[in-house]
């Protein structure tokens, strides 16, 4: 899983010289995700992914700049979405990770045009990842009980 997430970050985030990035992925239960969604986004109910990007949040004078990204994913949302034809739990989890990384890269999906652009990028990145990884082998069925 680490390799897939590293590759996803490489595909989604711009490369910046002399800057490192720390990325934390958190998997939350629906209740916790709903609380975060209300507190930080102002929306009621659960959501699939929330991203926080703290550019230069960990800057230490004289040392390499470090950005910190936190991505919160709700596996229960992925499980529910996987009930739709052509979708799997594993591909939804990867999609949510990619979606969060694209937000961290500055992409938005608030307007119809932005949403279309973001969906195109999501499809491109997940397609590249799928050619390299078998999502079902990475996210074993046991992770559904998070």
For the regions a language model picked out, list residue spans one by one.
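An acidic/histidine-cluster motif and surrounding catalytic segment
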Residues: 1-94, 102-146
């Amino acid at each position: 899983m680490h390799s897939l997430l590293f590759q996803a970050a490489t595909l989604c985030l711009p490369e910046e010289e002399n800057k490192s990035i720390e990325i934390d992925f958190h998997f939350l239960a629906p209740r916790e995700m709903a609380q975060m969604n209300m507190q930080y986004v102002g929306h009621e109910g659960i959501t699939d992914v929330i991203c926080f990007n703290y550019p230069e949040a960990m800057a230490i004078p004289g040392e390499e700049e470090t950005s910190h990204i936190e991505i919160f994913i709700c596996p229960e949302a992925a499980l529910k979405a996987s009930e739709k034809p052509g979708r799997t739990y594993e591909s939804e989890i990867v999609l949510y990770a990619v979606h969060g990384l694209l937000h961290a890269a500055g992409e938005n999906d608030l307007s119809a045009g932005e949403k279309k652009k973001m969906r195109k990028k999501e499809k491109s990145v997940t397609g590249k990842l799928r050619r390299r990884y078998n999502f079902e082998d990475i996210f074993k069925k046991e992770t559904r009980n998070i």
